From Swiss-Prot:
PANTHER family: TRNA N6-ADENOSINE THREONYLCARBAMOYLTRANSFERASE (PTHR11735), TRNA N6-ADENOSINE THREONYLCARBAMOYLTRANSFERASE, MITOCHONDRIAL (PTHR11735:SF6). This is tRNA N6-adenosine threonylcarbamoyltransferase. Pfam families: TsaD. Its cofactor is Fe(2+). HAMAP family: TsaD. Its main location: cytoplasm. Substrate binds at residues 134-138, 167, 180, 272. Required for the formation of a threonylcarbamoyl group on adenosine at position 37 (t(6)A37) in tRNAs that read codons beginning with adenine. Is involved in the transfer of the threonylcarbamoyl moiety of threonylcarbamoyl-AMP (TC-AMP) to the N6 group of A37, together with TsaE and TsaB. TsaD likely plays a direct catalytic role in this reaction. It catalyses: L-threonylcarbamoyladenylate + adenosine(37) in tRNA = N(6)-L-threonylcarbamoyladenosine(37) in tRNA + AMP + H(+). One of its GO terms (biological process) is tRNA threonylcarbamoyladenosine modification. InterPro entries: ATPase_NBD, Gcp-like_dom, KAE1/TsaD, Peptidase_M22_CS, TsaD. The gene is tsaD.
Length: 339
């Protein structure tokens, strides 16, 4: 079975073709970073228009890369949510229309389930069950995962997601867009221990998180200490340290609560090297393992959607002619895939 995956939930157009026997046959990605850079963030209308321009050409490129034609595709998977509604509608409309024209089934895919399953694309995929640390620009949550579709949210951010906090703090520090990766790069030059940032909500029970207050703490630290280059690097170091330590503390609680020892990190922030190191250290302490996708599959991509869609199609989950786009869609509302 070969599945075409379409991802257009935000500011990346991702197209991929996945074969259940041969694996990933094609993977195309177009980032809109330059388009939104002047605005300091994603402009939804511009994102939607750009998806309209890029999706079909990228599908043609993917088919060519895989040496396939439309007749070789057995199903189309598209991101139906959560995300920007206009951007979602572009991918959903194109995906549903192509499936109808080609006479194959279409399946709407949950964006965060795609991220959660991205490590399954690797040579050493994680076995179930595990605790998933889903961290991106729009979501931060701890999820108990017993199987595909068997998700229980253990805790989530009550305000800014981790990736959002990175980007907003970077903007506060005068870094270019997208600021998260630039802040991490600046943090590499920082002096450990010069500043100590709080670990939000770690002194209270539970697994919910909060990252918005770290922006204010950053602003106050800059105001009190100036913003010369080394001070900026030291502040970036302390900020990143606080976010990663907070996630590690919450993950440790999740492991204790569930009795699990396997950790999966997924989402855009899963590319952060310090976060990986913190969770690898945690896994080592509990005698467990940590899994994460290769860097190119940490950000939004079509490969994860194609893979997740294949699992859903094998479960006979086929959409009707309606075009689905759900800007809000809790991951624990998904149905389990029958084993």
């Amino acid at each position: 079975m070969r599945i075409l995956g379409i991802e257009t939930s935000c500011d990346e157009t991702g197209i991929a073709i996945y074969d259940d026997e041969k694996g990933l046959l094609a993977h195309k990605l177009y980032s809109q970073i330059k388009l939104h850079a002047d605005y300091g963030g994603v402009v939804p209308e511009l994102a939607s228009r750009d998806h309209v321009k890029k999706t079909i050409p990228l599908i043609k490129e993917a088919l060519k890369e895989a040496n396939l034609t439309a007749k070789d595709i057995d199903g189309v998977a598209y991101t139906a949510g959560p995300g920007l509604v206009g951007a979602l509608l572009v991918g959903a409309t194109i995906g549903r229309s192509l499936a109808y024209a080609w006479g194959v089934p279409a399946v709407p895919v949950h964006h965060m389930e795609g991220h959660l399953l991205a490590p399954m694309l690797e040579d050493n995929p994680p076995p179930f069950p595990f605790v998933a640390v889903l961290v991106s620009g729009g979501h931060s949550m701890m999820v108990e995962v017993k199987g595909i579709g068997e998700y229980k949210i253990l805790g989530e951010s009550i305000d800014d997601a981790a990736g959002e906090a990175f980007d907003k703090t970077a903007k506060l520090m005068g870094l270019d867009y997208p600021g998260g990766p630039l802040l991490s790069k600046l943090a590499e030059k920082g002096t450990p221990g010069r500043f100590k940032f709080p670990r939000p909500m770690t002194n209270v029970p539970g697994l919910d998180m909060s990252f918005s207050g770290l922006k204010t703490f950053t602003a106050n630290t800059i105001a009190a200490n100036g913003d010369d280059e080394q001070t900026r690097a030291d502040i970036a170091y302390a900020f990143e340290e606080a976010v990663c330590a907070t996630l590690a503390i919450k993950c440790k609680r999740a492991l204790e609560q569930t009795g699990m020892k396997r950790i999966v990190i997924a989402g855009g922030v899963s590319a952060n090297r310090r976060l990986r190191a913190e969770l690898e250290k945690l896994a080592h302490k509990v005698g467990g393992d940590v899994y994460y996708p290769r860097t190119e599959f940490c950000t939004d991509n079509g490969a994860m959607i194609a893979y997740a869609g294949m699992q859903r199609l094998k479960n006979n989950e086929v959409s009707d002619l309606a075009v689905e786009a759900r800007p809000r869609w809790p991951i624990d509302q998904l149905t389990p895939v029958m084993k």
